[in-house]
Curated annotation (Swiss-Prot):
A GO CC term attached to the entry: endoplasmic reticulum
Coiled coil regions, renumbered to chain: none
UniProt main location, coarse: cytoplasm
Protein name: Uncharacterized oxidoreductase pbr1
Organism annotation: Schizosaccharomyces pombe (strain 972 / ATCC 24843) (Fission yeast)
InterPro entries in alphabetical order: NAD(P)-bd_dom_sf, SDR_fam
Subcellular location: Cytoplasm; Endoplasmic reticulum membrane
CDD domains in alphabetical order: retinol-DH_like_SDR_c_like
């Protein structure tokens, strides 16, 4: 009985295929075209893997988006991961960390409070990190944190009065690396240290005014907030390039060569929570429109896993161990800088001087407020 039934079904499908072969061919071509286009828009993937057991990696922006994918990758490779959070972890974050430890079979995943938009929070964390004898191990710093405000939103400032995007995208990471410099320099000569920082193509639009870094005295570009992000990314890339050069010029007590490698990774346009906030204009109706256009976003843009491939490449590829120049990675390949200011030492010195002055002013104002509160 089963054999005649199977024969009947096979014959029916065969006849149906012959009758409607044109429709099936068109459908197959359409599906293949969409799949090929999606494969192209997803970008390149890295094939490198790396054993990171025993390594200590510090990650900013590791609680969502690309940073979250990077944290999971590092944990799966066996690294001890320190995730820097803006606030004390809530129950959701605690559950996520516990689940991540279970999935990756790695118990060495921790969180620390370090709000990159607050210079005082960064100083408190970084000072605590370096206040240790012997020097704490630190193999890698991955800077994934970033803020991009939606268009037509008013200027947002931190509690310390600094423009939010400038503080989070540049001034906070700058403060962190500036204070952690002794720890980075103090690592054993045989230990390779990497700094991997997120950037984006908006750095090409950067136009930094050293007398007004966060545009506090200029009209805020409500229609194009990415210009502020462009300033921050240009500043960060310039500082990282200078940071690497000064590390190479630093003479170690053991006379060994510099083993620091700085890589800036451009993930491209990725469907992250930050992107969703920007294209939805931070509104409920915008979010509804974003959901309606989801097939369009899915087809054209990368997911977080594909967006993180350049980070995976920067973390795992052995080619960077032999490169002494700070490099920019896009689609898992080293590319040239589009702004000559990044490699200009005079531009870097002006930037560092202005950033130091801004941080000093922020900390000075905080001390004044603290004294006033204590007198009340």
């Amino acid at each position: 009985m089963p054999i005649p039934i199977i024969a009947h079904i096979a014959q029916f499908k065969y006849e149906h295929l012959i009758t409607h072969w044109a429709q099936y061919t068109k459908a197959a071509i359409a599906v293949s075209t969409i799949a090929a286009f999606k494969f192209w828009t997803s970008g390149r993937t890295t094939t490198w893997e790396r054993k990171m057991n025993g390594m200590v990696v510090m990650v900013t922006g590791g609680s969502s988006g690309i940073g979250q994918v990077v944290v999971e990758k590092l944990a799966s490779l066996g690294a001890q991961v320190v995730i820097l959070l803006r606030t004390e972890p809530d129950q959701f974050t605690v559950d996520y960390i516990m689940d991540l430890r279970k999935r990756t079979k790695n118990q060495l995943i921790y969180t620390e409070v370090c709000d990159l938009s607050s210079m005082l929070s960064v100083r408190k964390f970084a000072t605590k990190w370096i206040d240790c004898t012997p020097i704490r191990r630190l193999d890698m710093i991955v800077l994934c944190s970033g803020v991009l405000l939606p268009p037509f939103m008013d200027r947002q400032t931190t509690e310390e009065g600094v423009e939010l995007q400038w503080a989070t995208n540049f001034l906070g990471p700058y403060q962190l690396l500036r204070i952690l410099r002794p720890v980075i320099y103090g690592q054993p000569g045989h230990r390779e240290v990497r700094i991997v920082a997120a950037t984006c193509s908006s750095y090409i639009l950067g136009n930094i005014d050293f007398n007004d870094l966060d545009l506090s005295n200029h009209p805020y570009p409500r229609k194009s907030p990415w210009k502020v992000v462009g300033n921050a990314k240009l500043a960060l890339m310039t500082y990282l390039y200078d940071f690497q050069k000064k590390a190479e010029a630093h003479e170690r007590p053991d006379k060994m060569p510099c083993n620091l490698h700085t890589i800036m990774a451009n993930p491209g346009v990725v469907r992250t929570p930050g992107f969703r906030r920007v294209v939805s204009f931070g509104k409920v109706w915008g979010l509804f429109l974003y959901l309606l256009l989801w097939p369009f976003w899915w087809l054209l843009l990368k997911g977080t896993i594909h967006g993180a491939q350049s980070f995976f490449h920067a973390i795992c590829s052995p080619e960077f161990a032999s490169i002494t120049q700070p490099v920019l990675v896009n689609e898992c390949s080293i590319v040239e800088y589009s702004r000559k200011e990044i490699t200009d030492p005079e531009f870097a010195e002006k930037l560092i001087k202005a950033a130091d002055a801004q941080i000093d002013e922020v900390e000075k104002q905080y001390k004044k407020k603290k004294i006033k509160k204590s007198k009340k």
